[in-house]
Amino acid sequence: MKEIRYKNIDRLLNPSQIAFIGGADAEVAINEAKRRGFKGSIWPVNPKRDYIAGYKCYKSVLDLPKGPDAVFLAIPASQIIRTVNELNHVNAGGIVCYSAGFKEIGQRGISLEKQLVKSLKDMVLVGPNCYGVINYLENSALWPFAHGGFCPGFGAAIITQSGMLSSDITMNQRSLPLTHMISLGNQASLKNTDFINYLIDKKEVRAFGLHIESIENISDFEVAAKKAIEAQKPIVVLKTGKSKIGATLTKSHTGSIAGSQKIYNSFFKKLGIITVDTPSEMIETLKFICISGIPKGKECAAFTCSGGGATMVADIGEMLNLKFSKIPKKNIKAISSFLPNIATISNPCLLYTSPSPRD
Protein backbone atom coordinates (compact mmCIF):
# COMPACT_ATOMS: atom_id res chain seq x y z
CA MET A 1 0.00 0.00 0.00
CA LYS A 2 1.34 3.44 -0.94
CA GLU A 3 2.39 5.49 2.09
CA ILE A 4 0.05 8.39 1.22
CA ARG A 5 -2.86 5.96 0.83
CA TYR A 6 -2.14 4.43 4.24
CA LYS A 7 -1.85 7.90 5.77
CA ASN A 8 -5.20 8.99 4.35
CA ILE A 9 -6.95 5.83 5.56
CA ASP A 10 -5.55 6.69 8.98
CA ARG A 11 -6.90 10.24 8.68
CA LEU A 12 -10.30 8.88 7.67
CA LEU A 13 -10.56 6.46 10.60
CA ASN A 14 -8.90 8.71 13.20
CA PRO A 15 -9.96 12.24 12.22
CA SER A 16 -9.33 15.45 14.09
CA GLN A 17 -11.81 17.27 11.82
CA ILE A 18 -14.83 16.00 9.90
CA ALA A 19 -16.58 17.98 7.17
CA PHE A 20 -20.24 17.04 6.65
CA ILE A 21 -21.41 18.10 3.19
CA GLY A 22 -25.15 18.03 2.50
CA GLY A 23 -28.46 18.77 4.19
CA ALA A 24 -30.75 16.49 6.19
CA ASP A 25 -28.54 13.39 5.84
CA ALA A 26 -25.49 15.38 6.89
CA GLU A 27 -27.38 16.61 9.95
CA VAL A 28 -28.17 13.05 11.02
CA ALA A 29 -24.53 12.08 10.53
CA ILE A 30 -23.38 15.04 12.66
CA ASN A 31 -25.69 13.99 15.47
CA GLU A 32 -24.43 10.41 15.25
CA ALA A 33 -20.81 11.59 15.45
CA LYS A 34 -21.66 13.61 18.55
CA ARG A 35 -23.54 10.70 20.08
CA ARG A 36 -20.58 8.42 19.40
CA GLY A 37 -18.44 10.83 21.43
CA PHE A 38 -16.38 12.50 18.70
CA LYS A 39 -14.30 15.29 20.27
CA GLY A 40 -12.79 16.86 17.16
CA SER A 41 -13.97 19.72 14.94
CA ILE A 42 -17.28 19.41 13.07
CA TRP A 43 -17.62 21.50 9.91
CA PRO A 44 -20.97 21.46 8.05
CA VAL A 45 -20.87 22.61 4.42
CA ASN A 46 -24.11 23.82 2.83
CA PRO A 47 -24.53 26.94 0.66
CA LYS A 48 -28.23 27.31 1.52
CA ARG A 49 -28.22 26.94 5.31
CA ASP A 50 -26.68 29.02 8.07
CA TYR A 51 -26.58 26.28 10.70
CA ILE A 52 -26.82 22.50 10.78
CA ALA A 53 -27.20 20.64 14.09
CA GLY A 54 -26.16 23.82 15.91
CA TYR A 55 -22.93 24.29 13.94
CA LYS A 56 -22.30 27.27 11.66
CA CYS A 57 -22.25 26.22 8.00
CA TYR A 58 -19.49 26.94 5.54
CA LYS A 59 -20.84 27.92 2.13
CA SER A 60 -18.17 26.02 0.22
CA VAL A 61 -15.43 23.44 0.75
CA LEU A 62 -12.99 26.17 -0.26
CA ASP A 63 -14.06 28.20 2.80
CA LEU A 64 -12.99 25.52 5.31
CA PRO A 65 -10.20 26.47 7.76
CA LYS A 66 -8.01 23.64 6.44
CA GLY A 67 -8.27 20.33 4.65
CA PRO A 68 -10.43 18.05 6.83
CA ASP A 69 -9.12 14.62 7.75
CA ALA A 70 -12.48 13.04 6.92
CA VAL A 71 -15.51 14.02 4.85
CA PHE A 72 -19.09 12.75 4.89
CA LEU A 73 -20.56 13.41 1.46
CA ALA A 74 -24.36 13.31 1.05
CA ILE A 75 -25.20 15.36 -2.03
CA PRO A 76 -26.66 14.51 -5.47
CA ALA A 77 -24.39 12.35 -7.63
CA SER A 78 -24.26 15.11 -10.26
CA GLN A 79 -22.43 17.38 -7.79
CA ILE A 80 -19.91 14.84 -6.53
CA ILE A 81 -17.04 15.32 -9.01
CA ARG A 82 -16.91 19.11 -8.56
CA THR A 83 -16.96 18.73 -4.78
CA VAL A 84 -14.22 16.07 -4.81
CA ASN A 85 -12.04 18.36 -6.92
CA GLU A 86 -12.49 21.08 -4.30
CA LEU A 87 -11.62 18.63 -1.52
CA ASN A 88 -8.44 17.78 -3.39
CA HIS A 89 -7.63 21.47 -3.59
CA VAL A 90 -7.78 21.85 0.22
CA ASN A 91 -5.89 18.56 0.83
CA ALA A 92 -8.63 16.50 2.47
CA GLY A 93 -7.75 12.99 3.62
CA GLY A 94 -10.59 10.53 3.13
CA ILE A 95 -14.22 10.59 2.02
CA VAL A 96 -17.31 8.59 2.88
CA CYS A 97 -19.62 8.91 -0.14
CA TYR A 98 -23.12 8.12 1.07
CA SER A 99 -24.56 9.30 -2.26
CA ALA A 100 -25.88 6.67 -4.68
CA GLY A 101 -26.36 6.80 -8.46
CA PHE A 102 -23.12 5.18 -9.63
CA LYS A 103 -22.13 1.69 -10.79
CA GLU A 104 -25.23 0.14 -9.29
CA ILE A 105 -27.56 1.93 -11.76
CA GLY A 106 -25.89 0.78 -14.99
CA GLN A 107 -23.71 2.21 -17.74
CA ARG A 108 -24.30 5.89 -16.99
CA GLY A 109 -23.40 5.31 -13.36
CA ILE A 110 -20.35 3.23 -14.28
CA SER A 111 -18.98 6.14 -16.30
CA LEU A 112 -19.58 8.57 -13.43
CA GLU A 113 -17.91 6.23 -10.95
CA LYS A 114 -14.80 6.02 -13.14
CA GLN A 115 -14.66 9.83 -13.18
CA LEU A 116 -15.02 9.83 -9.40
CA VAL A 117 -12.07 7.46 -8.91
CA LYS A 118 -9.91 9.49 -11.29
CA SER A 119 -10.73 12.73 -9.48
CA LEU A 120 -9.61 11.36 -6.08
CA LYS A 121 -5.87 11.49 -6.82
CA ASP A 122 -4.25 10.74 -3.43
CA MET A 123 -7.46 10.95 -1.40
CA VAL A 124 -9.21 7.72 -0.38
CA LEU A 125 -12.93 7.05 -0.59
CA VAL A 126 -15.37 4.61 0.99
CA GLY A 127 -18.32 3.96 -1.30
CA PRO A 128 -20.09 5.40 -3.12
CA ASN A 129 -23.50 4.01 -2.17
CA CYS A 130 -22.40 3.13 1.37
CA TYR A 131 -23.19 3.94 5.00
CA GLY A 132 -19.67 4.81 6.10
CA VAL A 133 -17.27 4.05 8.94
CA ILE A 134 -17.36 3.85 12.73
CA ASN A 135 -14.21 3.67 14.84
CA TYR A 136 -15.31 2.37 18.24
CA LEU A 137 -11.79 2.61 19.65
CA GLU A 138 -11.49 6.35 19.03
CA ASN A 139 -15.22 7.23 19.06
CA SER A 140 -15.44 8.68 15.58
CA ALA A 141 -18.34 8.07 13.21
CA LEU A 142 -19.22 9.04 9.67
CA TRP A 143 -22.59 7.32 9.67
CA PRO A 144 -26.05 8.40 8.42
CA PHE A 145 -28.32 6.44 10.78
CA ALA A 146 -28.75 5.63 14.45
CA HIS A 147 -26.19 3.02 15.44
CA GLY A 148 -25.25 0.91 18.42
CA GLY A 149 -22.35 -1.33 19.36
CA PHE A 150 -19.80 -1.26 22.14
CA CYS A 151 -16.05 -1.65 22.56
CA PRO A 152 -14.32 -2.87 25.75
CA GLY A 153 -10.94 -1.96 24.24
CA PHE A 154 -10.77 -4.87 21.79
CA GLY A 155 -13.01 -6.72 19.38
CA ALA A 156 -13.82 -7.49 15.77
CA ALA A 157 -13.52 -5.25 12.73
CA ILE A 158 -16.58 -5.73 10.52
CA ILE A 159 -16.30 -4.89 6.82
CA THR A 160 -19.44 -5.27 4.71
CA GLN A 161 -20.73 -4.50 1.24
CA SER A 162 -24.25 -4.00 2.60
CA GLY A 163 -25.16 -0.81 4.42
CA MET A 164 -28.27 -2.12 6.16
CA LEU A 165 -26.50 -5.31 7.27
CA SER A 166 -23.74 -3.25 8.85
CA SER A 167 -26.34 -1.10 10.58
CA ASP A 168 -28.16 -4.19 11.86
CA ILE A 169 -24.94 -5.64 13.27
CA THR A 170 -24.23 -2.44 15.20
CA MET A 171 -27.65 -2.87 16.82
CA ASN A 172 -27.06 -6.48 17.87
CA GLN A 173 -27.81 -7.37 21.49
CA ARG A 174 -25.42 -10.35 21.57
CA SER A 175 -22.49 -8.59 23.31
CA LEU A 176 -20.19 -8.69 20.29
CA PRO A 177 -17.20 -6.41 20.99
CA LEU A 178 -16.48 -4.13 18.04
CA THR A 179 -13.46 -2.06 17.06
CA HIS A 180 -14.58 -0.89 13.62
CA MET A 181 -17.64 -1.00 11.37
CA ILE A 182 -17.00 -0.30 7.71
CA SER A 183 -19.71 -0.25 5.04
CA LEU A 184 -17.99 -0.40 1.64
CA GLY A 185 -20.82 0.00 -0.85
CA ASN A 186 -19.50 -0.08 -4.42
CA GLN A 187 -15.80 -0.28 -3.39
CA ALA A 188 -14.82 2.19 -6.10
CA SER A 189 -11.63 3.18 -4.29
CA LEU A 190 -11.09 1.38 -0.99
CA LYS A 191 -11.64 -2.40 -0.93
CA ASN A 192 -12.02 -4.76 2.02
CA THR A 193 -8.37 -5.73 1.52
CA ASP A 194 -7.24 -2.13 2.09
CA PHE A 195 -8.88 -2.13 5.51
CA ILE A 196 -7.57 -5.59 6.42
CA ASN A 197 -4.03 -4.46 5.54
CA TYR A 198 -4.47 -1.25 7.54
CA LEU A 199 -6.00 -2.88 10.63
CA ILE A 200 -3.92 -6.06 10.72
CA ASP A 201 -1.29 -4.56 13.03
CA LYS A 202 -3.77 -3.00 15.47
CA LYS A 203 -3.50 -5.10 18.63
CA GLU A 204 -7.08 -4.25 19.59
CA VAL A 205 -8.42 -5.97 16.46
CA ARG A 206 -8.73 -9.69 17.25
CA ALA A 207 -10.70 -10.88 14.21
CA PHE A 208 -12.29 -9.72 10.97
CA GLY A 209 -15.90 -10.22 9.94
CA LEU A 210 -16.52 -9.81 6.21
CA HIS A 211 -19.79 -9.66 4.33
CA ILE A 212 -18.88 -10.34 0.71
CA GLU A 213 -20.98 -10.17 -2.43
CA SER A 214 -18.00 -10.54 -4.75
CA ILE A 215 -14.19 -10.34 -4.75
CA GLU A 216 -12.79 -8.05 -7.43
CA ASN A 217 -9.08 -8.85 -7.03
CA ILE A 218 -8.45 -12.45 -6.00
CA SER A 219 -4.67 -12.07 -5.58
CA ASP A 220 -4.98 -9.00 -3.33
CA PHE A 221 -7.57 -10.78 -1.20
CA GLU A 222 -5.37 -13.87 -0.91
CA VAL A 223 -2.39 -11.81 0.25
CA ALA A 224 -4.48 -9.96 2.86
CA ALA A 225 -6.08 -13.18 4.11
CA LYS A 226 -2.69 -14.85 4.55
CA LYS A 227 -1.47 -11.85 6.54
CA ALA A 228 -4.48 -12.16 8.83
CA ILE A 229 -3.88 -15.88 9.39
CA GLU A 230 -0.18 -15.26 10.11
CA ALA A 231 -1.18 -12.59 12.63
CA GLN A 232 -3.62 -15.11 14.22
CA LYS A 233 -6.56 -12.85 13.46
CA PRO A 234 -9.18 -15.12 11.89
CA ILE A 235 -11.44 -13.97 9.07
CA VAL A 236 -15.11 -14.93 9.25
CA VAL A 237 -16.95 -14.56 5.93
CA LEU A 238 -20.66 -14.27 5.25
CA LYS A 239 -20.96 -14.69 1.46
CA THR A 240 -24.25 -13.67 -0.14
CA GLY A 241 -25.46 -13.98 -3.70
CA LYS A 242 -25.36 -17.80 -3.59
CA SER A 243 -28.68 -18.41 -5.33
CA LYS A 244 -29.55 -17.34 -8.88
CA ILE A 245 -31.97 -14.74 -7.55
CA GLY A 246 -29.44 -13.61 -4.94
CA ALA A 247 -26.77 -13.17 -7.60
CA THR A 248 -29.15 -11.03 -9.65
CA LEU A 249 -29.97 -8.88 -6.62
CA THR A 250 -26.27 -8.51 -5.84
CA LYS A 251 -25.63 -7.05 -9.30
CA SER A 252 -28.46 -4.54 -8.95
CA HIS A 253 -27.48 -3.66 -5.37
CA THR A 254 -23.80 -2.74 -5.68
CA GLY A 255 -23.05 -3.58 -9.30
CA SER A 256 -21.01 -6.67 -8.33
CA ILE A 257 -20.89 -10.07 -10.03
CA ALA A 258 -21.40 -12.81 -7.46
CA GLY A 259 -19.67 -15.76 -9.18
CA SER A 260 -19.79 -19.50 -8.44
CA GLN A 261 -20.38 -20.39 -4.79
CA LYS A 262 -18.42 -23.65 -5.14
CA ILE A 263 -15.37 -21.71 -6.31
CA TYR A 264 -15.68 -19.28 -3.40
CA ASN A 265 -16.05 -22.13 -0.88
CA SER A 266 -12.90 -23.84 -2.16
CA PHE A 267 -11.01 -20.56 -2.15
CA PHE A 268 -12.02 -19.71 1.42
CA LYS A 269 -11.18 -23.21 2.65
CA LYS A 270 -7.72 -23.04 1.08
CA LEU A 271 -7.03 -19.77 2.91
CA GLY A 272 -8.27 -21.03 6.29
CA ILE A 273 -11.21 -18.62 6.27
CA ILE A 274 -14.23 -19.46 8.42
CA THR A 275 -17.51 -19.34 6.49
CA VAL A 276 -20.97 -18.78 7.97
CA ASP A 277 -24.47 -18.66 6.52
CA THR A 278 -26.26 -16.04 8.63
CA PRO A 279 -25.48 -12.76 10.43
CA SER A 280 -26.22 -14.49 13.75
CA GLU A 281 -23.59 -17.15 13.02
CA MET A 282 -21.10 -14.43 12.12
CA ILE A 283 -21.75 -12.52 15.34
CA GLU A 284 -21.51 -15.59 17.59
CA THR A 285 -18.37 -16.89 15.85
CA LEU A 286 -16.61 -13.54 16.11
CA LYS A 287 -17.67 -13.17 19.73
CA PHE A 288 -16.19 -16.56 20.58
CA ILE A 289 -12.89 -15.73 18.86
CA CYS A 290 -12.62 -12.25 20.41
CA ILE A 291 -13.42 -13.43 23.95
CA SER A 292 -11.99 -16.96 24.10
CA GLY A 293 -9.34 -16.90 21.41
CA ILE A 294 -8.70 -19.40 18.64
CA PRO A 295 -9.59 -22.99 19.62
CA LYS A 296 -6.51 -25.20 19.95
CA GLY A 297 -8.32 -28.49 19.41
CA LYS A 298 -11.67 -30.25 19.36
CA GLU A 299 -12.15 -30.87 23.08
CA CYS A 300 -14.81 -28.72 24.69
CA ALA A 301 -17.14 -28.34 27.65
CA ALA A 302 -20.76 -27.25 27.32
CA PHE A 303 -23.23 -25.88 29.85
CA THR A 304 -26.98 -25.59 29.31
CA CYS A 305 -30.05 -24.70 31.34
CA SER A 306 -32.26 -27.56 30.15
CA GLY A 307 -32.10 -31.23 29.35
CA GLY A 308 -33.34 -30.54 25.83
CA GLY A 309 -30.62 -27.96 25.35
CA ALA A 310 -27.93 -30.37 26.54
CA THR A 311 -29.16 -33.00 24.09
CA MET A 312 -29.13 -30.56 21.18
CA VAL A 313 -25.61 -29.41 22.03
CA ALA A 314 -24.43 -33.02 22.16
CA ASP A 315 -26.08 -33.86 18.83
CA ILE A 316 -24.71 -30.81 17.01
CA GLY A 317 -21.29 -31.25 18.62
CA GLU A 318 -21.07 -34.80 17.31
CA MET A 319 -22.01 -33.60 13.82
CA LEU A 320 -19.13 -31.11 14.03
CA ASN A 321 -16.75 -33.79 15.31
CA LEU A 322 -16.29 -32.05 18.67
CA LYS A 323 -15.16 -34.06 21.68
CA PHE A 324 -17.01 -33.64 24.99
CA SER A 325 -14.36 -34.83 27.43
CA LYS A 326 -15.33 -36.67 30.59
CA ILE A 327 -15.09 -34.61 33.76
CA PRO A 328 -12.19 -35.87 35.92
CA LYS A 329 -13.36 -37.51 39.14
CA LYS A 330 -11.33 -35.06 41.22
CA ASN A 331 -13.37 -32.17 39.78
CA ILE A 332 -16.83 -33.68 40.17
CA LYS A 333 -17.07 -32.88 43.90
CA ALA A 334 -16.07 -29.25 43.34
CA ILE A 335 -18.60 -28.82 40.54
CA SER A 336 -21.32 -30.48 42.62
CA SER A 337 -20.92 -27.87 45.33
CA PHE A 338 -22.20 -25.20 42.92
CA LEU A 339 -25.23 -27.13 41.68
CA PRO A 340 -28.49 -28.39 43.21
CA ASN A 341 -28.71 -32.03 44.29
CA ILE A 342 -30.84 -32.97 41.27
CA ALA A 343 -28.14 -31.87 38.80
CA THR A 344 -26.35 -34.49 36.72
CA ILE A 345 -22.62 -33.86 36.51
CA SER A 346 -21.75 -34.61 32.90
CA ASN A 347 -20.45 -32.95 29.76
CA PRO A 348 -22.57 -31.31 28.39
CA CYS A 349 -23.48 -30.20 31.89
CA LEU A 350 -27.06 -29.35 32.78
CA LEU A 351 -27.19 -26.25 35.00
CA TYR A 352 -30.57 -26.12 36.68
CA THR A 353 -31.79 -22.54 36.99
CA SER A 354 -34.47 -23.32 39.60
CA PRO A 355 -33.78 -24.55 43.14
CA SER A 356 -34.50 -28.06 44.34
CA PRO A 357 -38.07 -28.70 45.56
CA ARG A 358 -38.58 -27.74 49.19
CA ASP A 359 -40.74 -29.31 51.87
Question: Which sequence ranges carry the predicted segments?
Answer:
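Catalytic-core regions of core metabolic enzymes
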Residues: M1-S354, R358
